[in-house]
Swiss-Prot record:
MSH (melanocyte-stimulating hormone) increases the pigmentation of skin by increasing melanin production in melanocytes. InterPro entries: Mcrtin_ACTH_cent (IPR013531). This is Melanotropin beta. It comes from the Eukaryota. GO terms for cellular component: extracellular region. Belongs to the POMC family.
Length: 18
């Protein structure tokens, strides 16, 4: 989810800074 990006979660095993 988009909220995961904002929380800085690494959903795909990589840091997502979106």
């Amino acid at each position: 989810b988009z909220i995961b990006y904002k929380m800085g979660h690494f959903r795909w095993g990589a840091p997502m800074d979106k």
